[in-house]
Amino acid sequence: MTISFQDGRYAARLARTDADLIACQRLRHQCFFGGAGQDRDAYDPICGHVMVEDQAGRLVATARLLEIASGAEIGKCYAAGCYDLSGLATCDAPMIEVGRFCIAADARDADVLRVAWGAFTGLVDARGIAFLFGCTSFAGTDPVPYGQAFQRLAARHLGPDTLRPRPKAAEVVRFADIPPEGAIPMPPLLRTYLAMGGWVCDHAVIDRHMQTLHVFTCLEVASVPPARAAALRALAQTASLP
């Protein structure tokens, strides 16, 4: 799996060396935990790692991608440790799990996210991917400040009952049980998924290790609005893929 994509001030590529992977792990640690260190786990060696760099070659965003041939392999993904994915396990179609997506605090530029999605799109088209999914994170472990966001998810964006993951993690909170008071907005990555027709499960997982709440999020590629799909493909047209 290779990818190379450039657009204006930023370029996206896959990590090629041990040093590249270490750079991704360091940025992840900085974004998720703060300070110096490396965020690494057993999934890193089996994933591709997208790097978005600025014109100076500085890493400003990263995400890791786990490609699986069909739902029959979904048990090996990160999300399977937190959610019951038996619905998606019945889908005979190639999928990619997007994980550990993060952007450097001093690079919160909409173009960074746009370039990352351009890179994802090129890969999706080249591989014939039918589903993109992952865990989208909310900072902190208290769901109350996100009450309005979770209520909106419950009202407008729940996935099909046949595919939607069921609770599995030790600590979960259902959207229906969160008072609609807190007004902190949804994270940008989740908003992007939803704008393309993505859907979510009906609960959030409390992740004490990462100090986040996360929500299973899925995008069925065939459901992306035609205008949005055309724009993403235009953005990705310079991508070089196998």
Regions found by a protein language model. Name each.
Residues 68-199, 204-212:
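Acyl-donor binding region in acyl/amide transferases
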Residues 16, 54, 67-69, 100-102, ...:
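Short, flexible loop/turn elements at secondary-structure junctions
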Residues 211-224:
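C-terminal "cap" of GNAT-fold acetyltransferases
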Residues 126, 235-242:
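Short, cationic low-complexity segments
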Residues 223-225, 229-231:
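Long, contiguous binding/interaction regions
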Residues 2-60:
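Short amphipathic alpha-helix that is part of the acyltransferase structural core
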Residues 50, 63, 101:
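Conserved GNAT-family N-acetyltransferase fold
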